[in-house]
């Protein structure tokens, strides 16, 4: 299930980032350039799961229940990937959970235009340290919020799983919980 999910996630990412790949098709296969889209991974995993369930004459809903906790673990790890790649953050904040990212990072990777269109640069913070000016943005760590929310859903499902009343119930809890987050 994992390999088709990764393939689906990559296809999804490439389709929605086609301008970056249309002139250099071999880059599609370079997983270090670009990323993965979880929606594509989930779609591909469900397609493979439905085929597998039909061939094996198994309950697709039971299999989806089984897959739910793994999906949540994958999402939690993916959010930490967003942290290490300094992406998928929220808008400006000066709150206690503010994540500070040096502007040099975005300049280095040619991503300053993303900050301009989002309005985050309107709140650029600049400090002088040892005579050197350091500029950074302060943003909501949305990866952290989503990761912690997913962890809470995972714990709820883990504790409830032995009490479920019907196949597909854990999937329903996941969908409702994730949607509420």
What are these regions (language model features)?
Residues 1-181:
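A feature for loop-to-transmembrane-helix boundaries and adjacent hydrophobic helices
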């Amino acid at each position: 299930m994992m390999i088709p999910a990764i393939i689906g996630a990559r296809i999804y990412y490439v389709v929605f980032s086609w301008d970056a790949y249309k002139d250099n098709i071999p880059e599609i296969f370079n997983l270090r350039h670009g990323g993965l889209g979880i929606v594509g991974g989930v779609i591909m995993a469900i397609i493979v799961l439905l085929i597998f369930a039909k061939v094996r004459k198994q309950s697709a809903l039971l299999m989806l229940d089984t897959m739910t906790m793994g999906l949540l673990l994958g999402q939690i790890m993916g959010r930490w990937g967003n942290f290490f790649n300094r992406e998928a953050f929220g808008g400006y904040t000066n709150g206690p959970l503010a994540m500070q990212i040096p502007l040099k990072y975005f300049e280095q990777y040619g991503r300053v235009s993303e900050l301009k269109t989002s309005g985050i640069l309107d709140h650029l913070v600049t400090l002088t340290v040892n005579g050197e000016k350091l500029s950074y943005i302060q943003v909501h760590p949305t990866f952290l919020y989503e990761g912690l929310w997913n962890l809470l859903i995972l714990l709820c499902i883990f504790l409830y799983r032995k009490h479920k009343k019907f196949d597909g119930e854990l999937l329903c809890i996941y969908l409702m919980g994730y949607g509420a987050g």
